[in-house]
Amino acid sequence: MRKLIIAVFLFVSSMVTNSNADGHGIKMGIILGFTGPIESLTPAMAASAELAFKEASDSGSLLGGKKISVTRADSTCVDSAAAVTAAEGLVSGGAVAIMGADCSGVTGAIAEKVAVPNGVVMISPSATSPGLTDINDRGYFFRTAPSDARGGQILADITKDRGVKSVAITYTNNDYGKGLADVYSAAVKAHGIKVTTVAAHEDGKADYSSEVAT
């Protein structure tokens, strides 16, 4: 969380001269999955960002003592259309920058459809899909979590170091899961480890016997 707080503070400092910052204060947005599969994680993530904003605001040193106001919005983690609508609400409300989103799919959608077209900086604390590296962000999108292009390689190295000879891979059927699975699969194969199957699965099912059977 310390890295997140520092990163948020830095990007606030760099963006407050944006023309959307009015004479009375600076509007910031936080968009995370307050509902959906990671709703138990996001309150602490949001609170840490709000702490950074508060420290900057209370310092009295931000653009001659400007104050920061923060608005939260729900990315849902899984519904890109809803996430885009929520992000549009933040921007139309005057947010000059956004902390978020969280899950890779909604993060990419917000970056490409809202943040970049409107010239609004966004910084994700958790989106790790390798595909986000290649989006045409024009310098407006950042993330503090490492790409799965690195994480998948590390997992493959650990698999090799433990002497594993074959693996079966199943992954959450979304941008995050597929990105990590693709990197891991290629990396373990490069280590000479056999991949017996690669299968997607949906979250929250009552029974995964069909996936296990493959």
Question: What residue spans do the PLM features occupy?
Answer:
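Short, conserved glycine- and acidic-residue-centered signature motifs
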Residues: 21, 42-45, 148
